[in-house]
Swiss-Prot record:
GO terms for cellular component: cytoplasm. GO terms for biological process: positive regulation of translational elongation; positive regulation of translational termination. Gene3D superfamilies: 2.30.30.30, Nucleic acid-binding proteins (2.40.50.140). Functions by promoting the formation of the first peptide bond. The modification Hypusine is found at K36. It is found in: Cytoplasm. This is Translation initiation factor 5A.
């Protein structure tokens, strides 16, 4: 699995964290100390990278959480078919099919940037 373990206090807004076994990008991060003898707690609000669902996590700041290793890669569109595009990775020359977001218009030979975590991929910009 492409993930590593880290403490909650080392996370920042914009970084990635695993919530409910889903890679999520952190939208907001806040800490609060509950009292004189209590340990600080962190509240994280995040959005799923591949499914877009909002999730939250509340943990002590010294708790360990999994951080996914999400790779940003370059690809070239080979062909398009409705909402799907056949993309070739520019580093490994692997070819695979990806779902095209509605707000992106792709043509063959366009170069794109996409995120990849294990077997999940998402086009971020063209």
């Amino acid at each position: 699995m492409a993930r590593e373990q880290t403490e909650v206090r080392e996370l920042d807004e914009g970084s990635y964290v695993m919530i409910e076994d889903t890679p999520c990008k952190i939208n907001s991060y806040s800490t609060a100390k509950p009292g004189k003898h209590g340990s600080a707690k962190a509240r994280i609000d995040a959005k799923g990278v591949f499914d877009g669902k909002k999730r939250s996590l509340s943990q002590p700041v010294d708790a360990k959480v999994w951080v996914p290793i999400v790779n940003r890669k370059q690809g070239q569109v080979v062909s398009t078919d409705g909402n799907d595009a056949q993309v070739m990775d520019l580093d490994t020359y692997d070819t695979f099919t990806m779902r095209v977001p509605e707000d992106i218009d792709l043509q063959p030979d366009d170069e794109i940037e996409y995120l990849q975590y294990e077997e999940q991929r998402k086009i971020t910009r063209s």
